[in-house]
């Protein structure tokens, strides 16, 4: 035990502790030039974890949070943020430790902070002493690398199924089509596109899955017939609403609507 502790102290002397056993570092911006860091990114260095974060257009993402989860010691993760070139580097030469690396990016948009998970190019664990390169991409949509849902957000609705014009027939969620028109750039600064999709039912209810975070004007129809719409439990019904996303969990966001004939 004494030997292991001594090795840990020697290896991690350049890190600081943040809240208990969590250790933090900073992106290596002082020892080498940007060109030198770029030239070295493609080669694995023993005892070093490094990589780069870019967005879907290939632009560097500064300020992304990279976490190397120490699978040997509880609550002793290594944490670093990316520099202006989207690059990061930290020592991973921890005795007998294996790490799995994840990342998030937090951005303010329309007055709210959103934290979104990054897509790893390689999510296999690695031995800290061996070192590794772990790059990430910030994607607004697409299936998650772990298969647990999507990177995009949810647009959910509650449909009043009773139709006063046809009391003997109940409206079906799956027959609803939503149209989302972006009201400006998306959260990553890219231009959004008009989304027109038929509803599907997910674990959180009927609606649209995997929608890029932005602010949208939303309309709804049922088999071609326009529906009245409002933000759930808010305001009067109308022909359209303009809405942004609210948090469902730490990294999952949603818009909730109410629809009626």
Region spans (language model):
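Sec-dependent bacterial lipoprotein signal peptides
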Residues: 1-13
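Long luminal/extracellular ectodomains of secretory-pathway precursor proteins
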Residues: 15-52, 59-261
């Amino acid at each position: 035990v004494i030997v292991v502790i001594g090795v840990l102290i020697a290896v991690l002397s350049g890190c600081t502790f943040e809240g208990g056993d969590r250790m933090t570092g900073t992106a290596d911006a002082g020892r080498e030039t940007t060109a030198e860091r770029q030239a070295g990114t493609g080669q694995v260095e023993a005892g070093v974890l490094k990589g780069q974060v870019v967005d879907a257009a290939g632009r560097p993402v500064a300020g992304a949070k990279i976490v190397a989860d120490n699978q040997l010691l509880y609550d002793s993760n290594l944490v670093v943020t990316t520099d202006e070139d989207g690059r990061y580097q930290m020592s991973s030469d921890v005795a007998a430790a294996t790490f799995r690396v994840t990342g998030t990016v937090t951005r303010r948009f329309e007055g709210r902070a959103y934290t979104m998970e990054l897509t790893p190019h390689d999510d296999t664990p690695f031995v800290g002493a061996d070192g590794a390169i772990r790059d990430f991409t910030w994607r607004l949509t697409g299936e998650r690398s772990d298969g647990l849902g999507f990177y995009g957000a949810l647009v959910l609705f509650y449909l009043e199924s009773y139709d006063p014009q046809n009391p003997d027939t109940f409206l079906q969620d799956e027959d609803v089509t939503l149209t989302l028109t972006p009201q400006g750039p998306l959260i990553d600064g890219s231009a959004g596109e008009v989304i027109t999709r038929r509803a599907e039912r997910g674990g959180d209810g009927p609606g649209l899955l995997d929608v890029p975070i932005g602010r949208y004007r939303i309309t709804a129809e049922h088999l071609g017939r326009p529906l009245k719409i409002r933000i759930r439990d808010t305001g009067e019904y109308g022909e359209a609403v303009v809405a942004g996303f609210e948090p469902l969990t730490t990294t999952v966001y949603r818009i909730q609507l109410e629809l009626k004939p």
